[in-house]
From Swiss-Prot:
<protein>
    <recommendedName>
        <fullName>Serine--tRNA ligase, mitochondrial</fullName>
        <ecNumber>6.1.1.11</ecNumber>
    </recommendedName>
</protein>
<dbReference type="InterPro" id="IPR006195">
    <property type="entry name" value="aa-tRNA-synth_II"/>
</dbReference>
<feature type="binding site">
    <location>
        <begin position="299"/>
        <end position="301"/>
    </location>
    <ligand>
        <name>L-serine</name>
    </ligand>
</feature>
<feature type="binding site">
    <location>
        <begin position="330"/>
        <end position="332"/>
    </location>
    <ligand>
        <name>ATP</name>
    </ligand>
</feature>
<keyword id="KW-0648">Protein biosynthesis</keyword>
<keyword id="KW-0436">Ligase</keyword>
<keyword id="KW-0067">ATP-binding</keyword>
<feature type="binding site">
    <location>
        <position position="453"/>
    </location>
    <ligand>
        <name>L-serine</name>
    </ligand>
</feature>
<dbReference type="InterPro" id="IPR010978">
    <property type="entry name" value="tRNA-bd_arm"/>
</dbReference>
<comment type="pathway">
    <text>Aminoacyl-tRNA biosynthesis; selenocysteinyl-tRNA(Sec) biosynthesis; L-seryl-tRNA(Sec) from L-serine and tRNA(Sec): step 1/1.</text>
</comment>
<feature type="binding site">
    <location>
        <position position="352"/>
    </location>
    <ligand>
        <name>L-serine</name>
    </ligand>
</feature>
<dbReference type="GO" id="GO:0005524">
    <property type="term" value="F:ATP binding"/>
</dbReference>
<dbReference type="GO" id="GO:0070158">
    <property type="term" value="P:mitochondrial seryl-tRNA aminoacylation"/>
</dbReference>
<dbReference type="InterPro" id="IPR002314">
    <property type="entry name" value="aa-tRNA-synt_IIb"/>
</dbReference>
<dbReference type="GO" id="GO:0003723">
    <property type="term" value="F:RNA binding"/>
</dbReference>
<dbReference type="GO" id="GO:0005829">
    <property type="term" value="C:cytosol"/>
</dbReference>
<comment type="similarity">
    <text>Belongs to the class-II aminoacyl-tRNA synthetase family. Type-1 seryl-tRNA synthetase subfamily.</text>
</comment>
């Protein structure tokens, strides 16, 4: 127990700048800013070292078995690591394994020495045992072992941290059929429906929504910042209708409904293959001066994965299918892309599918195909024209083994736009978050995880408004959503839209007690 505690404390102390000095611990840590510390940290590793979870069980053996093949696969993925980084990671891991075996052997010997000393003390009186050469030899050997371990524990902590800080950046394996390259190399698997034909120049969703007074995005910088929006009336009903339509369909298919926290620890994000400490990051971080390590989730996938973290699922309950509607928060740091409209916004509602399967690619691949089929069914019932893409290597991120995107036609934008994504993450997330299943024999094994968008509201609003617009400015409601809106057509408002009276207006009515401004 003492040895285990010592090994647990070493990385915590050294990471905070503490060093042994004359039998005591002193702090030599220089002052560092939060942003400086973030760059060299891995929250998942720290989370484990502080005892909240076990260390990630990364599958390094597969890299060691075929290092050339692994290096080639790494080069094809987009990420921080390149093939030249792999040998150092493998070397560090091998050295760490050898050192841990040496420590284990010494700790076993130390335990045996302790037992032998206790046996001598039990059978002889104190005076006699002190003179016993065997006792003296055991005590001397015990001191030697402790000295060796005192030097080995810090080295183990150093190697362990060095290994995990790099190895946790390694991506998942890649399906052999995945196209190689960037998004331009995506393979079209299916083309469903036809492009809508108009006798007029189709308008964009924002113009349509503003004229119908169902979307507001103007003059919000002083209210909620850029890339925010309001949905009003039929716009809000469309959102609720899409969520309820999707939810009801999935509940009928046996999905378990869930709600999840919006605020989560960084370790859960990193366990899912996301990087809250990246610069820039798409993840909103709560001020660490007030709330340590809390982040706003950009997808319910993170919360659902966190639900299973450090837990086992009974084998007979597999595969698990879950559905969750949540508000998603994304920084959208590339402000040059689509600055107006609903395509890239800081917050939106999304319905997410999440699955946990047993071992082997067959089960998780089947669930991925099932999720994709449901996505296609939903979009078909909404009457949209769309295409299914097999995404290439550089679009898989860290966790995906294979990923399918669906892009819907958006006439106002004049191009396809991504509306759903589905990924098979195999055991990438479960090895980091310890998502396990228990066999009927009681054995624990790593599960596979699969996630997929069921309904991303803003992007579906774009496709629906632009595809169903009419010459008179109204919008037809798809039959699948008519019961939720109570109408088959969204028409011009009968109310008077709000009038802006804030600063920088050429004409505005006077405020109480003030003349009108011209």
């Amino acid at each position: 127990m003492a040895a285990s505690m010592a090994r647990r404390l070493w990385p915590l102390l050294t990471r905070r700048g503490f060093r042994p000095r004359g039998g005591c611990i002193s702090n030599d840590s220089p002052r560092r800013s939060f942003t400086t510390e973030k760059r060299n940290r891995n929250l998942l590793y720290e989370y484990a070292r502080e005892g909240y979870s076990a260390l990630p069980q990364l599958d390094i053996e597969r890299f060691c078995a075929c290092p050339e093949e692994a290096a080639h696969a790494l080069e094809l993925r987009k990420g921080e690591l390149r093939s030249a980084d792999l040998p150092a990671i493998i070397s560090t891991w091998q050295e760490l394994r050898q050192l841990q075996e040496q420590i284990r052997s010494l700790e076993e010997e130390k335990a045996a020495v302790t037992e032998a000393v206790r046996a001598l003390l039990a059978n002889q009186d104190s005076g006699e045992v002190q003179q016993d050469p065997k006792y003296q030899g055991l005590r001397a050997r015990g001191r030697e072992i402790r000295k060796e371990l005192v030097h080995l524990y810090p080295r183990e902590a150093q190697l362990e941290e060095q290994f995990y800080l790099q190895a946790l950046k390694l991506p998942n394996q890649t399906h052999p059929d995945v196209p190689v390259g960037d998004e331009s190399q995506a393979r079209v698997l299916h083309m469903v429906g036809d492009k809508p034909v108009f006798s007029f120049q189709p308008r964009g969703h924002l113009e349509i929504g503003e004229k119908l007074d169902i979307i507001r995005q103007k003059r919000l910088s002083h209210v909620s910042g850029h890339r925010s929006y309001y949905l009003r009336g039929a716009g809000a009903l469309l959102q609720h209708g899409l969520v309820n339509f999707t939810f009801n369909k999935l509940l009928r298919r046996g999905f378990t409904p869930m709600t999840v926290p919006d605020l989560l620890r960084g370790a859960v994000f990193e366990g899912c293959g996301m990087t809250p400490n990246a610069n820039p990051s798409q993840i909103y971080n709560i001020d660490p001066a007030r709330f340590k390590d809390l982040n706003l989730a950009g997808t319910a996938e993170v919360g659902l994965a966190g639900y299973f973290m450090d837990h086992t699922v009974a084998f007979r309950d597999l595969p698990v299918r879950m559905v969750c509607s949540s508000t998603c928060y994304r920084a959208e740091t590339n402000t040059g892309q689509e600055p107006r409209g609903l395509y890239r916004v800081h917050h939106f509602t999304k319905v997410e599918m999440f699955g946990v399967t047993g071992p082997g690619l067959e089960q998780s691949s089947q669930l991925l195909e099932e999720f994709l089929s449901l996505q296609m069914e939903i979009l078909t019932e909404l009457g949209l024209h769309f295409r299914v893409l097999d995404m290439p290597t550089q679009e898989l991120g860290l966790p995906a083994y294979r990923k399918f995107d669906i892009e819907a036609w958006m006439p106002g934008r004049g191009r396809f736009g991504e509306v759903t994504s589905a990924s098979n993450c195999t055991d990438f997330q479960s090895r980091r978050l310890h998502i396990m299943f228990q066999t009927e024999a009681g054995e624990l094994q790593f599960a596979h995880t699969v996630n997929a968008t069921a309904c991303a509201v803003p992007r579906l609003l774009i496709a629906l408004l632009e595809s169903n617009q009419q010459k008179d400015g109204s919008v037809l409601v798809p039959p699948a959503l008519q019961s939720y809106l109570g109408t088959d057509r969204i028409t011009a408002p009968t109310h008077v839209p709000l009038q802006y009276i804030g600063p920088n207006q050429p004409r505005k009515p006077g405020l109480p007690g003030q003349p009108a401004v011209s």
